[in-house]
Each structure stands twice: as C-alpha cells, then as structure tokens.
C-alpha cells in the first residue's frame, strides 16, 4: 500500500507565508533529521453485528496525517457544533470541513514542508499505514463516502424559468469522518480502530445538476 505525499510541484517553490501557521514545523523537521520517526496504522471498518460475523472494511476510505494545529481542530469543532443548528448548516458542514483541511494543507505546503502532509487510501481489508512520520503531535483525519441515489424528477422548462428553481438533486454522498489527535514518541507505532460506532462526524455532500433542457 503506497503512501502519497500530497504536494503540487508548483508549491515547492512557493514563498513561505510568515505567521500563517499556529504550529512550529521546525520541530518536525528536527525530529526527522535526528531519525526520530513513527508509524501510524489502523483499520477503517463497519463493526460486526453478530459475534460470529466479520467486520466489513470500508472500501476507499482516505486517511490524512497533518501536524497538529489548534486552529484547525477548533474550526472543525465549530463546524460540527454548527451543523446541529439548522438543515442548511448540516448540509454544508462536510464540505466546509474539507475546505478547512485543504486550506491548512496549503499553508503547510507553502511554508516549505509538503512532506508533512501525508495521505493514503485503505487497502482491501480496510487497513492503512503511514510510515516514517517525524515524532510529534499529529492530527489523523479519515473520511469515507458512499453515494446514495435520491434522484428527483427533472424540472419542466416553464417551471424552471418561472420559479428560478435550484439545481436538481441527483443524490448525496453520506460522509463519515474521524478526527484523532495523537502524540507520538520516537521509534513507536500507533494503531487506530476507526469504525461506524466511533465516527466523529456524519454528514452529507449533495450532488446536484442544472437541467439543460425540458423535463420528460
């Protein structure tokens, strides 16, 4: 199972942004130079419902490790809390969480440390391993998405023009997310069990389309 270092080539030459991060990335670089590395492994699965049954791997789950940022954790917590306030907030929460994580990843890249953003997809058994991470404090963010078809009828052209209807719903991705904060010591390995019973957040990402012609 390969671990992908998420870094775009053009970012490798980007000018670092002073004061953009609330975490000292030099601590991780120094640990790496001293050879103080760790591994984070685990499984993402649906827990068995009967004692004699087997756990079911969550195929295509993605796991990301990032240097721990208090600002990012606080933002994710805020979005989770806000999702309980209204239906629109709930519908947007998963997307906003992804954007918050991607913004933080970009800051890490632009600070000259693209190798500190690690990502991998689970294997057929739902297992993953993130190896050779500098010892220190990390955020592990895992997600699993499953598309649910909830196709609504196509709009009639006259209705769409008269009422300015929104894009038509095709379905949504039921998204589960796990947030784990871990502190690692040199030469150690850590195992995480991520399953449907200890999900940190459950949300949706809607899939909509703007009808090009009259409904039939």
Residue ranges and their predicted role:
Residues 4-14:
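Bacterial N-terminal signal peptides
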């Amino acid at each position: 199972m390969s671990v992908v270092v998420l870094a775009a080539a053009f970012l490798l030459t980007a000018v670092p942004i002073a004061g953009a991060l609330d975490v000292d990335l030099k601590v991780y670089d120094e640990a790496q130079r001293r050879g103080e590395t760790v591994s984070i492994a685990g499984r993402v699965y649906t827990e068995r419902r009967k004692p004699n049954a087997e756990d079911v791997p969550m195929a295509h789950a993605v796991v990301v490790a990032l240097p721990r940022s208090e600002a990012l954790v606080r933002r994710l917590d805020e979005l989770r809390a806000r999702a309980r306030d209204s239906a629109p907030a709930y519908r947007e929460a998963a997307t906003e969480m992804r954007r918050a994580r991607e913004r933080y990843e970009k800051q890490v890249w632009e600070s000259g440390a693209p190798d500190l953003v690690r990502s991998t997809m689970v294997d057929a058994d739902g297992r993953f391993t993130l190896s050779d991470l500098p010892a220190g404090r990390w955020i592990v963010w895992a997600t699993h998405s499953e598309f649910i078809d909830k196709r609504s009828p196509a709009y009639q052209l006259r209705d769409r023009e008269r009422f300015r209807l929104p894009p038509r719903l095709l379905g949504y991705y039921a998204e589960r997310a796990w947030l784990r904060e871990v502190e690692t010591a040199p030469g150690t390995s850590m195992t995480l069990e991520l399953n449907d019973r200890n999900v940190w957040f459950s949300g949706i990402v809607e899939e909509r389309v703007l009808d090009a012609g009259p409904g039939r």
